[in-house]
Each structure stands twice: as structure tokens, then as C-alpha cells.
Amino acid sequence: MSCTKLFVLIFCVLQTVLAGEKPKAHLGGALRFNYNYSDWKEGNKHRGGDFGFDVFRINVNASWKKIRLDAEYRFYARTSGGGMLKYGWVGYQFNDNHVLQLGQNTVPFGAMPFNSNNYFFSINYYLGLEDDADMGLKYCFRKKGWELDAAFYKNADLLDFSEGVETSDSRYAYDIAGRNKEVNQGNLRVAYNWGERWKHQIGASAMYGGIYNLDTEKMGSRYAFAIHYTLNWKRWNLKAQYTTYKFSPENKEDEPRNQITMTAYGAPYEIAAHADTYTASLCYTFPIDKGILDEIRLYNDFSMMHKRKAGFNDSFQNITGCMLGMGPVLVYVDYALGKNQPWLGNDWNEAFTSATLEKGWNARLNVNIGYYF
């Protein structure tokens, strides 16, 4: 869908909403720029890093009676995938406890809304298991500390309905790509919150779905399970999560089944088809309220990927950084360390599979500056 068609669609929906009784609508967004200094890129180091455009996004939130609309569209550089819908759904809010969402909505899995604090997210994001949105129907229940989300997703965000077409690389979150496609996915997430001073949450998530191969026209399968725990105490926040997943594609006989293609931001790569991940995040917020600086949030986010295939080397990621809050301006300063992580090293296609090229850790200093409105 082109940007022009998307804006026309959003305009028409808003016009419909505004024609009703006492509608509510809000238009927001953000403009972000990014600086990075990567120690594995010789040219980047000689230049003292690079600074440029990151993303411009538009958010639309509207309601009429019990009908809700929530959407976010992002504009990246063409080399990073160009324009893409992050999420967009129409829903019905029965009351404060029950909501239905239809469309491209956020997949309920693990600690939410994020399993991390930094610009890079956790390693789960790069496997399609954090901050992902797919096309389907989701039911949300909230009452007396309980959270229940049940969803069915027909497929990942689909941009071309033609038969036999591979999944587009222009997407925000990672989905299965290449000659395989995500289909008929079910998700269930249950979490319980308790405590007043020490605010705890413990939860479990499950996902099961199909993998349709365009060549063999056979249906494979995939699953993922996770347990998570979060704690908020005063200005401290802790997140911890264990995740296991397995993809079983029905590829052609001459193609490997111990790895699978994933894609986002216009650049696909391979990941291990069977792995466990471990994540742990800790942050502390300092209230400042002086001048333009409201707060400083310090954090360290660690995650690792243990690959079940013999001979596949594990992947690691550790992000130490801070977020500076200045009214509508947020600045993330991150020192990212990665080992066998495609975004943090020279090995793009095999870092999440065999990972035989990288021998040590790589580092990236990243500063992201955004104005949110």
C-alpha cells in the first residue's frame, strides 16, 4: 500500500468517526535522528561515526462510542525498508475489562509492551518475539490484577496478495520470509500483577502456528513459549524472561531445515530454527526537573541466544545506556556490545545461525534523538 493510499484511508476513517456523536481523535508522531560509531566499520571509525535521519512516524488514535482505532505508520530511508505500517487496528471496547482488536495488532508475547529499555530492544526482537504485530483478531481482558490476551493471526503483515509472492522485506518487526510464510498463528498470554510498594508481574506466553512453503506447498509448524517476571520498586525496574522456540519448515529436500529466513527493514537474514533465549534488564530513573531536563534513566539490558543445533555458536547482546527525558524530546545514549549479532558485527547472514566468522565482541556507540508530539 502506497503512502498516499494510506493517508487517504486514514482520512476516510477519521471522517467517518468525526461524523458521529462527540468523537475523539488525536494525531501524533515523532521525528528522530541517529548517530552511530561502529568499531567493526573502518570507514565509519575514520569519519568519527555517522549522523543522519532515523524515522518520521505518524500516530492516529480515534474513538467513537465503543469503537476504537489505533495506528502507527513509519517512514524510514528507502534502504531501511521505506514506509511501513507498524500497527493499525479497529476495535470494540465492551467496557474497561474487555476489548477486541481487529487488524495488524501487537502480538501478545512475553513482558509487554517491551522486554527492554534501550534503542536496540532485546535479542528477542530480532527473532520476531518482541514488539511484533501481525494480521488478525485479538481479545484483551484486564481485571483485578489479571491480564489475559488471546489472539488468532491469519498471517504476518501482508503487502501483496498475489499467489506465490514472498513476504516483503519492508516491515518494522521481524517475520518469516524467503520461500516460507507465517500462517494461522494462535497466541495466548496470561499475567498476574500484585503488590503496592513492590509491584510484581509474573506471566506465561504460548504461540503455535503454521509455516507454508511456497515451493513444496506443504505446511510446516512453529511454536514458542515464554515465562517472564517484572518488578517495579520506587525508581527501580527489573525485567527477566526465558523463551524457547522451534520452527519446522517443509522446505525442498536440498534446502536446510535447521535455519530459516527472517526479514525486516529491507534486509533479510537467517536464524537458527531451534533456540532458547535469556534476557535480563535493570534500570533506575533519576528525577531531575531542572531546566529542560526532566529525568535520566540508567539501564543495562542483557540477552543471549542459545542455539540447539550442534556446531551453531551462541549469540550475545548487552546494552548499557541512559535515556534523557526533556519534555517531548527523548535522547537514548547506548553502548551496545554484541557477539554473533548481525546488527553488531560484520557477519550479517550467519550470525544467528552457525556464526563461524565472528571471533569476538563488537561495540557500537549509538545516540538517538527524537521529538515526540
Predicted segments, located by residue:
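Sequence/structural signature of outer-membrane beta-barrel proteins
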Residues: 34-42, 74-79, 109-111, 116, ...
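Outer membrane beta-barrel
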Residues: 22-38, 47-159, 191-195, 333
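Residues that define the transmembrane beta-barrel architecture of outer-membrane proteins
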Residues: 23, 47-56, 82-86, 131-135, ...
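Detector for outer-membrane/organellar transmembrane beta-barrel domains
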Residues: 192-308, 316, 371
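Outer-membrane beta-barrel "beta-signal"
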Residues: 280-282, 329, 359-373
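Outer-envelope beta-barrel architecture signal
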Residues: 21-29, 65-67, 96-98, 144-148, ...
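Transmembrane beta-barrel strands of outer-membrane/channel proteins
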Residues: 29-35, 71-75, 102-104, 150-154, ...
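Solvent-exposed loop segments that connect transmembrane elements
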Residues: 44, 159-177, 214, 248-269, ...
